[in-house]
Every structure is written in structure tokens, then in C-alpha cells.
Amino acid sequence: MTAVTTPDNAPELTPLDEVGDAWKEPSHGLRHEAVLAGARRLRARLAAASPVLAVRTLPVTTLPYPTRYAFQGAAASPAPFVTLTHRCLLVRFRQGDAVRTLLFNPTDVERARRTPFFAKLEGAVGSRVAKLLSTQFDPLEKQLERLGVAPADVDYVAFDHFHTQDLRGLLGTADGAAARFPNAKLLAPRAEWDEWGHLHPMQRAWYVADGREGVREDRVVFTDGDLLLGDGVMLVRTPGHTAGNQTLFVKTDRGVWGCSENGTAVDNWSPAHSRVAGVALTAKHQDLDVILNSNTPEGAAAQYTAMSLEKILVDPVPAAPEFVQMFPSSEVSPSLLAPGLSPSYLLQKVESGDVKSVGAQSFNAPGGFGAAAPR
């Protein structure tokens, strides 16, 4: 087994080896079995962990998205688009004696509009219609301010994958452009970072091609394996949707949650129980345990395995235990323009703990933000 190493510029992170080399198995079937065996070991570790201190959900934007991608072509609806609500998670957690802050998916909405797929869609329908189909929420900085969190308090930023992302505003650039989160490290899977520089034609529609150009790489932590960030919070490799896809797992006072864009609704992870017309029938006929968010078909088998891993690590939804607490970073939302395509159960947010009291504690506690903890 290849040892998972700690990134050189983030010695405070702990490598996780439960899944190990399973993703390198060349046989799709054997890889699936090996990854899920590792996932069960990882589940035991996560279940025994202390919970994170606080989690909040910060809405970013709504956007139209092809129905055929959202439910892998399984939804029996004439509506060409669903409406997705894209959200960011704020997580506060202990890392040794310090309290740390992570933003997961802090997408720069204005820069993301340059993503070729969405730029062409806006060009086809016109900017006025595009604005009617999307809603922008308060900037993340304003939402964080209401929670008592300043941009300088953010220690880490990470994304489930780099589709639609332009990182220059978040991290600043080598030529002096300011960073929105001046103290944050970006936790970036090396596999996807490298692919971003040499995109395949099947990938180009979903990336802002120059979205990483000029970014200060001294602010980037390149990762190659699964990582424990601190008490109750892990970033786990879930390749398939993209080469470097990763899922955030957090243990909260309401059980274990995961967050990724491998699916767009709880239905994707539990299709047998879906009330979206066509989804349960497709799953039954094809003997599928999950239905993909399928805009990137080149990695479908790996994505299926990744979603199966996610199901193992998270807990059931207490109010609807046939579904699991996999929170889509872009969740299908009810829309009059997409009748019959509402999720069978809407998650909408992950919420745990008290962010403000944690923030006050972190500044005063030994080893908190005011201490010379590793950066």
C-alpha cells in the first residue's frame, strides 16, 4: 500500500489510509469492492470522532441545469431544465488546541458566469431571461458578517470539484490582486489541478479555462489522498465526476453528513425510494443503487463507486430514513418551470452548533486564532 503523506505546507492535516490504494485497482468491479471495504473502515473512524463545533449553510445562487444531467436521463418529464440552488458550507472545528474555519464551495458567482456551458446558455436565452432563471443571494462576506465571522478568520477553502470555478478573486494573484479570504489555504486535489491545465474536449464546457492562472500557489495545498482536517471533519476522494472530486464529511450533533455534487437531490443516492417519475423505475430496471449527476460521462463507473462510498459514510435522514444525509452542493429546488421534478425530500441546509459562541471562544482560547498555530 502506498503511504498517504501529509502535504508539505499543511503539516497540521492528518492523512487517512483506510481506503488507501483501492482507487488504483484497474478492474471496475474489484475497485468498487475495495473502495467500499475501505469506506466501511472509514465510517467506523468517523462515527467514533468528536463532532465539529458548528456548521452553517450559506446560499450562493440559483441556476438552470439540464434535467437529463440532474437525474442521469431517468426523470420522465418534458421539462428541459431543473433549478439548482448552489450553497456553501461554513464549518468550525477543533484542530488540536486551535479552532479552525473552513468554507466549502465559496463559488465566485460573477466569475463563474464565464463557464462555457452557462455562458452559451445565457447567450441562447438572453441576459434578461437568464436573470429571471437565477437568484443571487447576499455576498458570502455579508452572510459571514451576520454570523460574526470575518474574511480573515477563514483558515481553509475547498471545493468538491473545480467545475465553474475561478479562484483568482478568492486567493489573490501573484501580480498583486487582493484575496477575498486573505489567510485561507486552498485544499486542492492535485489530480484535478493538473487536468485543469490540459482539458480534454469533453471537459471544456464546465471549466473556466483560465480560472487558476496567476493564483498564488503558495496559498494552495496540493492533496493526493484522504485527509482529516480536525475533529469530525474529513475530505475524502470521490473521483469520477471529475478526476479530483472530493466529498466533505462532517460529524454533527445530528449525525454524519456529506456534501458533494455527485448527485443533485436525495433521490440520486436512494433512487429506489424516489418519487420523481421515472427514477425508481430506471433504478429497478438497471439494478442501480445510485443515479448520477451525469454531465461528465467519462468517469461514470468511478462516480457510481464514489456515491456508494458516500452512502456508507453518512447517516439516514431522521425524518425520512429511506434517504441519506448527502447534501448536494447544488440541490434541485421546486420550480413552476419544472413540474414533477421536486426532490422526494428537500434537505436545504446543514445546521449544527452555535457559530457565534464558537467564534468568541476561539479568539480567547489558548491555541485559537490569536495563537501561532501552523498556517
Sequence positions of predicted segments:
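Active-site metal-binding motif and surrounding structural segment of the metallo-beta-lactamase
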Residues: 123-184
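C-terminal regulatory/interaction regions
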Residues: 2-49, 299-375
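Active-site/pore-lining binding-face segments in mid-to-C-terminal subdomains
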Residues: 230, 234-311
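Active-site neighborhood of phospho(di)ester-bond hydrolases with catalytic His/Asp-centered motifs
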Residues: 103-105, 155-162, 187-189, 237-240, ...
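Metallo-beta-lactamase
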Residues: 132-138, 143-149, 180, 185-237, ...
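Beta-strand-turn-beta hairpins that frame and shape the catalytic cleft
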Residues: 48-55, 92-101, 227-235, 254-257
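Conserved beta-strand hairpin/beta-sheet module of binuclear metal-dependent hydrolase folds
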Residues: 62-143, 247-263
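A short acidic (Asp/Glu
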Residues: 68, 166-171, 198-199, 247
